[in-house]
Regions:
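Conserved anion/nucleotide-ligand pocket segment
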Residues: 1
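Active-site-proximal catalytic alpha-helix in oxidoreductases
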Residues: 4-32, 36-49, 76
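NAD(P)-dependent Rossmann-like dehydrogenase/reductase catalytic/cofactor-binding core
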Residues: 39-137
């Protein structure tokens, strides 16, 4: 379970900065130090933390706070999703956003920020069913 929790923590950080950096073309420092963007980063991280519960992984609000503060301390770097976008490579939207959205839906929890990032990056609305976006083991 500790490994699963660490994987979820990594996804929380990735979901917080990767998609928004691709939408805004901003590096991590800008995302976490501009209030409106920082609020979206933090909100996406909270949504991802809630999604972890579907897999039986408990992420506390204090842990999300710690991860957000860690990201704020990063040097200004381009995220992997921004680099992929700039190089014309396919973005890992299903793995990063789709899995969070699907789990939040199954739990009846909101994922508005994550859903809006999906829509912005795909230029299409979310399907009614997200079956197949993740496999539960």
């Amino acid at each position: 379970n500790d490994i699963r929790k660490e994987l979820w923590k990594k996804l929380i950080v990735n979901c917080g900065v990767n998609p928004l950096s691709a939408v805004t073309r901003q590096k991590t420092y800008e995302l976490t130090h501009q209030p409106e963007l920082a609020q979206k980063v933090y909100g996406a991280m909270q949504e991802t933390g809630r999604a972890a519960a579907y897999d039986g992984v408990k992420i506390t609000p204090a842990e999300v706070d710690d991860m957000f503060n860690l990201i704020k301390s990063f040097n200004s770097i381009k995220t992997s999703m921004l680099i992929d976008l700039e190089k014309g490579r396919e973005l890992e939207l299903d793995a990063i956003l789709g899995s969070v959205i699907a789990r939040c839906r199954l739990l009846g929890k909101p994922a508005q920020i994550t859903e809006s990032l999906w829509t912005e990056l795909t230029s299409k609305p979310l399907p009614d069913s997200l079956d197949g976006l993740f496999n539960r083991e």
